């Protein structure tokens, strides 16, 4: 796509498509999220999310960056899902994975560019503070976040300590 965007400068429009929102499709909820495949075939959601994560890691991440250890990157994505709705502390994320803070920054950038996460800056009257204060981290799709933290059914979701953060993330992604 890089070559195309350079040669078509000024003559092409690029759109970022996110999973369906609640307004766009009535079946969207915290557990399923908004990916059309999961909404239409909820009985294969677990298989679909596993395949999505695998192909995302093998194809998309490798196309964007030369990540040496995809196993650690996969653990990083799972750790982020468990921190959904939290203030982003790169040091606290880097330490248990045994990677550096600059590596975490690079990996966050990859997830953000590929449309997996959003970082929501805090609101302050002072615009400068908005830019430097710690953002909150959310996954674009709550169904994917549920899958990554091991929530597979409604009962687990109802009992999960992540439920509030997942709801907050779903609102942020709308």
Predicted regions, residues:
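Conserved AAA+ ATPase "SRH/arginine-finger" region at the nucleotide-binding site
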Residues: 13-24, 42-43
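Switch/connector loops and helix/strand junctions flanking conserved nucleotide-binding motifs
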Residues: 1-3, 23-24, 146-147
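Hydrophobic/aromatic beta-strand patches that form the interior of the parallel beta-sheet core
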Residues: 13-16, 30, 138
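Accessory nucleic acid-recognition modules appended to NTPase machines
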Residues: 43, 47-174
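A residue-level signal for conserved active-site and pocket-lining positions in enzyme catalytic cores
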Residues: 25, 33, 76
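Short regulatory helix/loop adjacent to the ATP-binding pocket of P-loop NTPases
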Residues: 1-14
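Extended, charged alpha-helical "arm/stalk" segments used for dimerization and assembly
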Residues: 29-40, 52
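An amphipathic alpha-helix signature
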Residues: 22-27, 50-54
